[in-house]
Structures are given as structure tokens and as C-alpha cells.
Amino acid sequence: KYDERTESVHEVNETDYEQCNTVGKEHVLFNDGNTKVMLTKSGFRHFISGNQSHCQMGLKLMVVVMSNNTKKKLIHSPSPSSPSPSPSPSPSPSPSPSPSLSSPSPSPLPNNQGVTRSSGAEFIGVMMWLGVMMLLL
């Protein structure tokens, strides 16, 4: 929570984030004192304090939201063939094969081009960020 009379949160573009520009036509302004942001799509999100001096002291946050779309991009390897039936026991004892110490290697992870974000997660970090800022005041 933060004091909405003295503070606000701005969602900004990367340039305004880097320059702590608190005035911009494209800014999304939050000033309810208890900001929660839904992360509904992947990509970069930039948040700064609406108080420029606070932003310049480091009160800003960049979030990278990763997508959970690995099911679509998994590389399907052929299913393993059925194990061959074990031979019938022979009358003479034979040494049993030693167990394999190596396990099958896992399928490779998909090669994601670019950075993505988790969808549907509630963004509470802004609240914590502003709480820290209030402690600094």
C-alpha cells in the first residue's frame, strides 16, 4: 500500500522508464493506494514512481512476463519402441545383465525466440515496491 496523496505508479515505455519521465501520453496511471496489475500477456512491463525524484532514486521496476505455452512448442520425439520380450529361462544359469547406470536423456527444451511472460498472474510486486518506497520516506 502507498499514500495516494503523495505517490502514484505509472506504467511506461522503456524510454520513459530509463529517463524517469513521469509525464507521457501513453502512461497508464495508478493512484488508488493499493495497485495490483494483472499480467495477462507476455513481454516487458515498465513501472515507475509518479514522483520523479523517487524514480530517480531507483523507485522503478521492470518485469518480464514469461508465457506458459511450452505445450505448443515441444518437439515430439518418436515414442520408444516396445521392449522386446525377455527370453525364456534356459536350463543352464547365465549371468544376468548388469543394470544400466545411465538414464535416457530428456527431450530438448524448446528454443524460445524472444522473452515471454506468464499469463494470468496477479502482479503484487508493485505494491511491495511502493511499500519499500514508503519506508524510505
UniProtKB/Swiss-Prot annotation:
Q: Where does this one sit in the cell?
A: Symbiosome, Peribacteroid membrane
Tell me the disulfide pairings in this chain: C20-C55
Per UniProt, the ranges with Pro residues bias are 80-98
Q: Which Pfam family would be a valid example here?
A: Cu_bind_like
The UniProt record lists the Phytocyanin domain at 1-67
**Residues covered by region (Disordered):** 70-115
- Please give the name of this protein: Early nodulin-55-1
Pull one GO CC term from this UniProt entry.
peribacteroid membrane
**One Gene Ontology term of the molecular function aspect:** electron transfer activity
The entry sums up its family as follows: Belongs to the early nodulin-like (ENODL) family.
| Cited InterPro entries | Cupredoxin, Phytocyanin-like, Phytocyanin_dom
**Superkingdom classification of source:** Eukaryota
Q: Which residues are glycosylated?
A: N13, N51, N68
Q: Name one GO biological process term.
A: nodulation
Which PROSITE patterns does this chain map to? PHYTOCYANIN
Q: Which species expresses this protein natively? A: Glycine max (Soybean)
Q: Could you tell me which PANTHER family the record lists for this protein?
A: BLUE COPPER PROTEIN, EARLY NODULIN-LIKE PROTEIN 10
Keyword list (alphabetical) reads: Disulfide bond, Glycoprotein, Membrane, Nitrogen fixation, Nodulation, Signal
Q: What induces it?
A: During nodulation in legume roots after Rhizobium infection, and after release of bacteria from the infection thread.
Its biological purpose: May act as a carbohydrate transporter.
